[in-house]
Swiss-Prot record:
The gene is FAU. Belongs to the ubiquitin family. SUPFAM superfamilies: Ubiquitin-like. SMART domains: UBQ. This is Ubiquitin-like protein FUBI.
Amino acid sequence: MQLFVRAQELHTLEVTGQETVAQIKAHVASLEGIAPEDQVLLLAGTPLEDEATLGQCGVEALSTLEVAGRMLGG
């Protein structure tokens, strides 16, 4: 299935749904140069856990994930 990832640019990824969020972060790192530990992936504004698969997170075909930078402090 196709998945859109919006970081500095909009990327289209071909995925199966079995990939983990951590794997998607690693792919984004190779595309954008943002370290995985500095990324937060969001689906409809909800942060996704690294160890969860895309299917477990409710990601469907043609979903758009937003990449946000991790904020320090509070």
